[in-house]
Amino acid sequence: IGDIQGKDPVEAALDLLIEEENAVGMIDYYGSEELVIKFMKRPEQNFCTDGLLGGKPHPRVYGAFARGIGRYVRELKALSLEEAIFKMTYKSALTMGIKDRGHLAPGTKADIVIFDKNKIIDKGTYVEPTQYADGIKYVIVNGYAVIRDGDYVGGSSGTIVKL
């Protein structure tokens, strides 16, 4: 931005923050896919996303986990499907100290995603980030379907988990 405006980059960023009253977001791309895979294979790694909703979010807000399965499991074979699912669900829950989520067992919360492993993939781009992933048939949160036959049907069965 600074280069485009002929300003010092820090000055341009501060001017933008003032002009937009701090309502500024940033989408950053860095690193190589080779490095992503190297970290992904580490035993202590969990899958997550730190994207925020609203405005024009990072494409992974709508497709981080579908990308994990479609790109890194199916296409690149960096992980097995079982290992990826474990890192996305139970391992992540255990890391956060949440024992009643991330796996299916009596007394646990019934959060389930039913997908076609041969079709699941993220579709969001930096230009159009708010696209739902392909290949997801059902999403069931606390026993209620919020995606049915691939279509978002709404609902607010999820809850904020206090750590």
Give each language-model segment a name.
Residues 28, 99-100, 107, 122, ...:
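Residue-level detector of alpha-helical recognition elements and their boundaries
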Residues 162-163:
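Short beta-strand-to-coil "C-cap" segments at the C-terminal boundary of structured domains/repeats
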Residues 1-19, 31-117:
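His/Asp/Glu-enriched, well-ordered alpha-helical/loop segment
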Residues 38-44, 49-50, 64, 113-159:
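C-terminal cap of metal-dependent C-N hydrolases
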Residues 21-29:
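Short catalytic-site patches enriched in acidic/histidine residues
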Residues 27, 60, 129-131:
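Short Gly/Pro-enriched turn/cap motifs at secondary-structure boundaries
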